[in-house]
Design a protein with these regions (language model features):
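Residue-level detector of secondary-structure boundary/capping sites
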Residues: 18, 37, 75, 130-134
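C-terminal helix-coil-helix/basic helical segment that borders enzyme active sites and/or dimer interfaces
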Residues: 32, 36-43, 54-107
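Predominant activation on well-ordered alpha-helical scaffold segments within soluble catalytic domains
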Residues: 21-28, 47, 61, 85, ...
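Glycine-rich phosphate/cofactor-binding loops in nucleotide/flavin-utilizing enzymes
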Residues: 1-14, 99-148
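Glycine-rich beta->alpha junctions and the first turn(s) of the following alpha-helix
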Residues: 1-56, 125, 141
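Tryptophan-centric aromatic hotspots in well-structured domains and transmembrane helices
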Residues: 1, 27-30, 58-61, 84, ...
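Hydrophobic packing residues in well-ordered alpha-helices of helical domains and bundles
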Residues: 20, 46, 77-80, 115
Length: 148
């Protein structure tokens, strides 16, 4: 667990975080272009996604600060991995909901192709780097002291 815990302790999340921020900006631009930003339910869902992204950023900052101070990350790194994988999966679903069929059929048109790729990849993120179930087991055993 030590190696995997250190792997997830912030630095590996940075490229993902930057990618998520870019995806959020692109989605907001597309939503505005289509006039969907006038719909209260869309604004609410986007606000929830943006808030979740901000939580991810703050958690990552906290983990990186701890590592830079020489503190060995504990189960917090599993919380971070579990959170970002689930956030991105949910964000991928939001992208597809808002962009509709265009995101699936605009095969080579940017940014739709990038959004589709991100959606499909977001499913794999809940598996690689430690499946969500494994992360929950780590949290249960190490953070909550539950038996194996």
């Amino acid at each position: 667990m030590g190696t995997l815990g250190n792997e997830r302790a912030g630095a590996t999340v940075l490229p993902f975080q930057a990618s998520f921020e870019r995806e959020m900006r692109v989605l907001l631009d597309l939503v505005r272009t289509r006039g969907l930003d006038r719909l209260p339910v869309v604004r609410q869902r986007l606000a929830k996604a943006w808030s979740g992204l901000r939580i991810l950023q703050l958690n990552n900052d906290r983990l990186l600060t701890a590592v830079l101070q020489g503190v060995h990350p504990g189960p917090e790194s599993s919380i971070g991995k579990l959170y970002w994988a689930n956030w991105h999966r949910d964000f991928g679903e939001l992208m597809m909901d808002l962009l509709g069929a265009d995101a699936l059929v605009a095969a080579d048109q940017e940014p739709m192709a990038e959004m589709r790729h991100s959606f499909l990849n977001s499913r794999a993120e809940t598996i690689y780097g430690g499946a969500n179930e494994i992360q929950r087991n780590i949290l249960g055993e190490r953070a909550l002291g539950l038996p194996k």
